[in-house]
Amino acid sequence: MRRRRKLEHKTYKLNIESFSHEGRGIAHFEDKIIFVSDALPGELVIANRTFSCAKFEEADAKEILKPADNRMKPKCDVFGICGGCSFQNLSSEDQIQIKSRWLKKVFARQAKVEPETWLKSLQFQSWGYRRKARLGIRYVAKKDKVLIGFRERKSSFITNMSRCEVLHPSIGEHLEVLANCIERLSIKSSIPQFEVVISESGIALILRHLESLSVKDEKILADCAQELNITFYTQSGGLDSVKPLDEPTILTYSHSNYNIIMEFLPTDFVQVNFKLNQQMVSLAVELLELNESDKVIDLFCGLGNFTLPIARYAKYVVGIEGDLGLVERAKYNAEKNSINNVDFYRSDLCKEVVGFEWFKGKTYNKALIDPSRSGAIEIVELLPKLGVTRLVYVSCNPATLARDTLKLIKLGFTLETAGVIDMFPQTSHVESIALFVKR
């Protein structure tokens, strides 16, 4: 991480020439590249420098002298301060175009390839979509006030938010109620964060606390839970310390196209955008072109988000996941949904796997990969040994997707099609999906 030293005050007058993938304007000044927050291509701005190194500088736009025609008024009154969003000054269409251009650029630059066709970008609602988030909490003693929000941009401070426009409204519209609740606790200065998940069947909120809650504190939380129709979970240490304050709530999301209901725990990884997740899974199933003779392997399968819908059409599916708890819940969800042609195994896919039962002597003609941001270079190299000829790759990092694409091409695969999944509207985060075929 770069160390940020104190800078002499410097103000620029800049013409913004283009846009970076993370949502900053790009300008040039005295042979240096300047990355400018809150500035759009075509704008003339006054900007204050915030960072400097040999190759580039960073700045914040303080005055827009000539706004771009496509500049939008942000919906949120803390946009530009809060680090949660970076694209609220752009329309949904412009956001998609920027993300699509970035994906194309990364493919061309790193993998020296372009897909034979481009998929239409997947998108749904732009606001109130986010069903899982971690927000910071800070008690300000001088004001006797609790702040709840995402971290400020380029800062560890908590944004003072009364509402959040991207969070699902069942929580996003009630941050003040939560703040008022925490202000009444005896340990309000020892609560650094909460994590919330808004499922289709209930809401769970995990409250991290560094001191023990009193009986009175628990009563305050119980009253707040009743008011907001949520279930509080407390967390005094690691993940194994998470426990419900009262009766646990059953958390679910559905794949209605496949008659599947998924149950999960509040600490489990799930996609934050349920509606777009349904679209993404349907697209993946479509791209796999499944039939009753297919044997499919789903790598980094998690709860079985893709595995179980795939099993509705394939002969047999194997899901591989490194987290034992997720493997156990994937098995539970398969049984609960009466899906019998699937097996799940625990394996660390970043380590040697050739000796495992699901690998040794086994073949699969189709595969799905949905790795973390670090990508799947280790497992990609093994796909030919498994007999895979058709692969759907779901990515949350275009850079590692492009790196793995280069390896797949060397292994004889062709990049048939790819496109953007706008899982996180109003942010610069780029999810994508790609189809590879080995002839």
UniProtKB/Swiss-Prot annotation:
E.C. number(s) listed in UniProt: 2.1.1.190
Any single GO BP term: rRNA base methylation
Residues engaged in binding [4Fe-4S] cluster: 76, 82, 85, 164
Enzyme class, spelled out: transferase
Gene3D superfamilies documented for this protein: 2.40.50.1070, Nucleic acid-binding proteins, Vaccinia Virus protein VP39
GO MF annotations, alphabetized: 4 iron, 4 sulfur cluster binding; iron ion binding; RNA binding; rRNA (uridine-C5-)-methyltransferase activity
Positions of the TRAM domain: 5-63
Disulfide bonds: none
Keywords for the protein's UniProt record, in alphabetical order: 4Fe-4S, Iron, Iron-sulfur, Metal-binding, Methyltransferase, rRNA processing, S-adenosyl-L-methionine, Transferase
Pfam families: TRAM (PF01938), tRNA_U5-meth_tr (PF05958)
CDD domains listed in its UniProt record: AdoMet_MTases
Catalyzed reactions per annotation: uridine(1939) in 23S rRNA + S-adenosyl-L-methionine = 5-methyluridine(1939) in 23S rRNA + S-adenosyl-L-homocysteine + H(+)
Residues at which S-adenosyl-L-methionine binds: 271, 300, 305, 321, 348, 370
Catalytic residues, chain numbering: 396
Family assignment from sequence similarity: Belongs to the class I-like SAM-binding methyltransferase superfamily. RNA M5U methyltransferase family. RlmD subfamily.
Function description: Catalyzes the formation of 5-methyl-uridine at position 1939 (m5U1939) in 23S rRNA.
Name of the protein in its database record: 23S rRNA (uracil(1939)-C(5))-methyltransferase RlmD
Species this protein is from: Vesicomyosocius okutanii subsp. Calyptogena okutanii (strain HA)
Organism lineage: Bacteria, Pseudomonadati, Pseudomonadota, Gammaproteobacteria, Candidatus Pseudothioglobaceae
